[in-house]
């Protein structure tokens, strides 16, 4: 028998998933429009994201100057790298792919974990994450990247992103790093005893909760674009 409390918890989880999906669609749509057609808007969005992440980081780590200063290193760097890459017209489609990858792994890892359960990935840091969710999220991100690249007139100049096999492999690697980045920030949230960094994005929490994956993935993504 399921208790009333458990029913309420399940209903809340279901509502949270719907909110997460809806707000995710809105965010993705906004960023796709900005990346493809309004470069200046993308710059503004990324600066606002960076400021939002820094604000939430400062609120979270205000009791420790050492941890507070870490945020002024790990947040501006990925934001700056993504803005720099976007200045090149040839990178706009690849950047769109990048956001599709890091956001799809997060969404499908959550759906996969809640649907199929399984062994906990890092119970002390992020109790809801599972190995099953990680695998489903990673593979889904790779497949979505390939599917998006099949859109007619969708031409990518970078060979490693235009080749479907390489794209799938790179996408899976970025997806795994995105989940590692998520756990990295979750470690600090646990350390300072907070669940969400904020509540500005429905279903996601704060800006840091939604964009934490760029902290580790953006430098890798930048390296791939520059050196491959």
Swiss-Prot record:
Question: What are the entry keywords?
Answer: Cell membrane, Lipid biosynthesis, Lipid metabolism, Membrane, Nucleotidyltransferase, Phospholipid biosynthesis, Phospholipid metabolism, Transferase, Transmembrane, Transmembrane helix
Q: Name one GO cellular component term.
A: plasma membrane
Record membrane topology: Multi-pass membrane protein
What are the subcellular locations of this protein? Cell membrane
Q: Which InterPro entries match?
A: PC_trans
Q: Membrane spanning segments where? A: 31-51, 65-85, 93-113, 131-151, 165-185, 206-226
Q: Give an example GO molecular function.
A: phosphatidate cytidylyltransferase activity
| Example of a GO biological process term | CDP-diacylglycerol biosynthetic process
Query: Which reaction(s) does its UniProt entry say it catalyses?
Result: a 1,2-diacyl-sn-glycero-3-phosphate + CTP + H(+) = a CDP-1,2-diacyl-sn-glycerol + diphosphate
**Pathway the protein takes part in:** Phospholipid metabolism; CDP-diacylglycerol biosynthesis; CDP-diacylglycerol from sn-glycerol 3-phosphate: step 3/3
Record's protein name = Phosphatidate cytidylyltransferase
Query: Where does this protein come from, organism-wise?
Result: Rickettsia typhi (strain ATCC VR-144 / Wilmington)
Q: Which gene encodes it?
A: cdsA
């Amino acid at each position: 028998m399921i208790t009333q409390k458990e029913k309420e918890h399940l209903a809340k989880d279901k509502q949270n998933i719907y909110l997460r999906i809806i707000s995710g669609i809105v965010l993705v749509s906004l960023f796709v429009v900005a990346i493809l057609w309004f470069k200046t808007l993308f710059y503004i969005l990324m600066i606002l994201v960076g400021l939002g992440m820094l604000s939430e980081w400062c609120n979270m780590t205000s009791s420790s100057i050492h941890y507070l200063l870490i945020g002024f290193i790990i947040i501006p760097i990925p934001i700056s790298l993504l803005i720099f890459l976007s200045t090149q017209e040839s990178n706009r489609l690849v950047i769109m792919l990048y956001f599709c990858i890091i956001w799809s792994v997060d969404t499908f890892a959550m759906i996969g974990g809640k649907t199929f359960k399984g062994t906990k990935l890092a119970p002390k840091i992020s109790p809801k994450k599972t190995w099953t969710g990680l695998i489903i999220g990673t593979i889904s991100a790779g497949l979505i990247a390939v599917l998006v690249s099949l859109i007619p007139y969708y031409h990518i100049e970078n060979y490693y992103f235009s080749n479907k096999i390489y794209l799938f492999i790179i996408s899976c690697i970025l997806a795994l790093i995105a989940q590692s980045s998520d756990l990295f920030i979750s470690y600090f949230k646990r350390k300072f005893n907070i669940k969400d960094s904020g509540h500005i994005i429905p279903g996601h929490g704060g800006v840091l909760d939604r964009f934490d994956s760029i902290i580790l993935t953006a430098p890798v993504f930048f390296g791939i674009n520059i050196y491959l």
